Amino acid sequence: LLIWTALDIRHGRAGLPRGLGFGALAVVAVTILAGALVAGMDAGLLYNEYPLMGSGLVPVEYGDDGVMDAFENPASAQFHHRWIAVLAMLTVLAFGLRAMRHHTSRLPGMLAMMMVLVQFGLGITVLLQGVPVSLGGLHQAGAVVLLGLTLWTVHRFPA
């Protein structure tokens, strides 16, 4: 909300996000929330490989905790974060490509696309390295930067 207000002051009031812009913002926000669950459960320590989680794409523990599985099972939390992150990357890339067609959103669109690729690669690196605190913190900071760049892009090109 603070970033959006700052953008309103700097560039004038923008319409509410809609369409692919809303989708990009929503999936980035959900990815951050899923990442918070991973961090809170130390779920990144379970499967330090990518794209597989043990012997397959889905961990063997998936669904063990029933209805609360997403919130109580570290393996499921990591699984969800991985695949929501893939969706976030694809959505931000699609929205960024669309935003780059308009002169007012070209720069933020390009930066958001670059950042989503950096963030995705950093997430995999953090996992493969066994989640060192320095890289984990950098990955969390990257999430904030990605959210800010996505907000900026949506503000300049809300469709």
What are these regions (language model features)?
Residues 1-159:
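Polytopic transmembrane helical bundles with strong interfacial aromatic enrichment
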